């Protein structure tokens, strides 16, 4: 198939291996990555200086992307650089027209996007078959869509020919809430976030004591306050164990009582990929104490490195974390259950080793491999 894959840096960690596999299976993929001033530091992308011109370019305008050149390939890969705000609606429409004309010139079988189009881009729905991947079908706690984003989502759901969500459990609720026909909604899953294996920097400082890791953007639904309280209970029994909390975002709770606790380390900034790789590789395991969620890219990053997780049993997390097989599931917002399971996984090395071997076998081949995930996508697009 000939597909335009139109996405943004926020999903690069799961998009890059998907694009790689699609191309390896012989499909012509025109990969278009939209850069805005707010997306220059996100997931795999760590750009310090924006290219000082809006337009459509090859990826080599950003040297920071060169590490991925051999992984995804630069043929048929483009950057829409929209980092300089347009001063008027006329400029916005003019730029959008240029993008639409460029996209339409490929005459693709599908435009496959991970983002509802902005209103200036709406004509793309009328002249193309559009497939939409929705990573988060419902807003997280403490996060609400603006009126503009809600409208863009409504238009996208109405006019997209195919809609993909990344778990089975939420499909029915999604269709009911947004009044979408189940016939055009297809489910799939995330695969391994393989790009993390490209990174390793021994010069980044890391705690030499054993530690468990919370990683990801800090937001109210992440449940970090429950993790800290659980860890304090564990730390009395295992004073050698540390907790690292790593991620950008505004702290939504009072961290000051924990500031001087030496066994708790807060890295509250954008974590680049070198540091991410070091943190994951050296952690005992990862903890995802979410109060609500759909699926989790953090879990897939952990699984890529065969690291197990302790995760709250919320949303569709249990489709990925199978209790005592690929991780441990705990009751959300339950400090006792969380601390018990963290202690179990920390002290039971045999259990951890068994789980890590399961992860390796399940995600390197079979139905959870990118090869199978990609074939499912193509089969859905052909229906």
Predicted segments with their positions:
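Acidic donor-binding loop of glycosyltransferase active sites
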Residues: 278-294, 307
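Donor nucleotide-sugar binding/catalytic pocket of nucleotide-sugar-dependent glycosyltransferases
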Residues: 159-198, 373
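Conserved donor-binding/catalytic core segment of Leloir-type glycosyltransferases
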Residues: 205-222, 228-231
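A short, well-ordered alpha-helix in the C-terminal region of glycosyltransferases
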Residues: 240, 337, 344, 351-366, ...
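Short hydrophobic beta-strand element within catalytic cores of glycosyltransferases
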Residues: 308-311, 321
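Conserved acidic donor-binding segment of nucleotide-sugar-dependent glycosyltransferases
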Residues: 323-324, 328-335, 342-350
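Nucleotide-activated donor-binding/catalytic signature segment of Leloir-type glycosyltransferases, i.e.
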Residues: 254-277
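Membrane-proximal helix-turn-helix segments that form the acceptor-binding/catalytic region
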Residues: 97-104, 146-166
């Amino acid at each position: 198939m000939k597909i335009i894959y139109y996405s943004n840096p926020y999903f690069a960690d799961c998009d890059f291996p998907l694009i790689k596999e699609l191309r390896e299976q012989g499909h012509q993929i025109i990969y278009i990555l939209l850069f805005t001033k707010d997306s220059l530091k996100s997931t795999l992308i760590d750009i310090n200086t924006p290219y000082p011109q809006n337009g459509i370019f090859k990826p080599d305008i950003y040297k920071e992307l060169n590490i991925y050149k051999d992984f995804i390939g630069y043929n048929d890969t483009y950057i829409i650089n929209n980092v300089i705000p347009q001063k008027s609606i006329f400029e916005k429409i003019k730029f959008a027209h240029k993008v639409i004309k460029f996209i339409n010139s490929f005459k693709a079988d599908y435009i496959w996007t991970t983002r509802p189009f902005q209103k200036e881009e709406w004509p793309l729905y009328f002249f193309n078959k559009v497939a939409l991947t929705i990573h988060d079908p419902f807003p997280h706690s403490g996060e609400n869509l603006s009126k503009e984003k809600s409208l863009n989502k409504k238009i996208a759901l109405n006019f997209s020919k195919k809609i993909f969500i990344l778990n089975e459990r939420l499909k029915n609720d999604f269709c009911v809430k947004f009044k979408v026909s189940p016939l055009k909604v297809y489910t799939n899953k995330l695969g391994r976030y393989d790009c993390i294996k490209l990174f390793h920097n021994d010069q980044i400082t890391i705690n030499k004591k054993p530690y468990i890791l919370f990683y990801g953007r800090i937001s109210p639904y992440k449940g970090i306050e429950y993790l800290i309280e659980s860890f304090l209970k564990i730390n009395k029994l295992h004073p050698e164990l540390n907790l690292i909390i790593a991620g950008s975002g505004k702290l939504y709770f009072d961290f000051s009582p924990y500031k001087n606790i030496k066994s708790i380390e807060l890295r509250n900034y954008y974590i680049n990929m070198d540091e991410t790789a070091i943190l994951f590789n050296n952690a005992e395991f990862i903890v995802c104490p979410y109060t609500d969620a759909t699926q989790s890219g953090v879990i897939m990053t952990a699984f890529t490195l065969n690291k197990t997780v302790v995760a709250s049993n919320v949303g569709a997390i249990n489709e990925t974390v199978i209790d005592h097989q690929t991780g441990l599931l705990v009751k959300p917002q339950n400090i006792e259950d969380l601390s018990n399971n963290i202690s179990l996984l920390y002290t039971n090395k045999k259990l951890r080793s068994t789980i890590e071997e399961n992860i390796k076998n399940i995600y390197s081949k079979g139905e959870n491999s990118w090869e199978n995930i990609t074939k499912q996508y193509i089969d859905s697009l052909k229906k």
